[in-house]
Amino acid sequence: MSAPQIPNLNTLRRGGGRGRFRARGGPDSSSSSGNKDRVVQGTDNDASVSRLSAVELGYLEDPFARALTPMGQEMRRLPIINRGTYVRTTAIDQLVASFLGLKADSDPTWKLKKKQIISLGAGSDTRVFRLLSLRPALDIIYHEIDFAVNNTAKIKAIQGTPLLQRVLGQSQVSISNEGDELHSPAYHIHAVDLRTLAQKGEGDKSTGQDPGRRLQDFVDTTLPTLLLSECCLIYLSPNDAAGVVRYFTHTLFPASQETETLALVLYEPIRPDDAFGRTMVANLATRGIQLQTLHQYASLGAQRQRLREHGFNGGQAAADVDFLWERWVAEEEKERVAALEMLDEVEEWKLLAQHYCVAWGWRKGSTRFTGWGDLDGQSAEE
């Protein structure tokens, strides 16, 4: 999942952010609100272009990237953007792999347990296809939530691409009349405005006509579940962003002794108040992009506190992209990546990478989850 220039590390210089900035549309019918939603929706193209750039240059292996990039929009990104896309993607891949029990040293019991992922603002993200291609060894249900317009584009791509259809399989796949929702045994695409979920009260499982009803119909609340938000919640107001997380932690997955593990991974920009951060925010504003929770969760410490406040008491950690490059990427792999392109802007790379972070936390469940204990987080605002 990705983000505009910004969340994808994509663009202080080229504009265009990408984003797991997605899934958030709104009940507000004003033209101003509609325009803001369209700006956020448009960041998905930037994300897919950045992903394809990194794939074609050899940073990442992703056979599905081209199928989910709009025709004619291919573009080679700057080296620092390609490296940022690489670090963000591989770091989140490591967290996902650990949660799913895909590592060689994963607990055998946990590894065999069926699990669920819910991706907020997924847009054109390819992770679902990369994971579903591991079946039947991997038993998983994958949900994506986004604006209807982004879903429609993705579903059309699936319908027109045999490669994606083969991964999904042909059995029991249904598409809504509007073409903005898809449902199958292992993969669901939901057209839901996240702000409507934020408006539901704690423990409120009423159905009515709201989109949350459809979500509740398909989400299996008995499974260990991982929530992904790659530059998605940051586009909501602080109250709505917190409300969305509460919807999952209190309404769909209320904590109890019988509750299964619930985890959350966030990818967001940070540190808006130094010189680089102020320039970043100003550049995004010229494109109509407003990061509404940026100042509330401006540091690694604030992101960790956010996770604690939402009940992720099993553990919380966070690290900026610079730290992840230095500590999570093996030296041999660093050499391989460095050989792909000449990266002259080392100082700029470090500045950019220090202004984006990955944060992760989990809530203990009836099945023990320890898969993130070996992943280093940053202990201080270095």
Curated annotation (Swiss-Prot):
Residues 1-11 have a biased composition (Polar residues). GO terms for biological process: methylation. Pfam families: LCM (PF04072). S-adenosyl-L-methionine binds at residues 88, 121, 146, 193-194, 230. Residues 1-45 are annotated as: Disordered. Keywords: Methyltransferase, S-adenosyl-L-methionine, Transferase. It catalyses: [phosphatase 2A protein]-C-terminal L-leucine + S-adenosyl-L-methionine = [phosphatase 2A protein]-C-terminal L-leucine methyl ester + S-adenosyl-L-homocysteine. Gene3D superfamilies: Vaccinia Virus protein VP39. Transmembrane segments: none annotated. GO terms for molecular function: protein C-terminal leucine carboxyl O-methyltransferase activity. Its EC number is 2.1.1.233. It is an enzyme of class 2 (transferase). Methylates the carboxyl group of the C-terminal leucine residue of protein phosphatase 2A catalytic subunits to form alpha-leucine ester residues. Belongs to the methyltransferase superfamily. LCMT family. PANTHER family: LEUCINE CARBOXYL METHYLTRANSFERASE, LEUCINE CARBOXYL METHYLTRANSFERASE 1. This is Leucine carboxyl methyltransferase 1. It comes from Emericella nidulans (strain FGSC A4 / ATCC 38163 / CBS 112.46 / NRRL 194 / M139). The lineage of its organism: Eukaryota, Fungi, Dikarya, Ascomycota, Pezizomycotina.
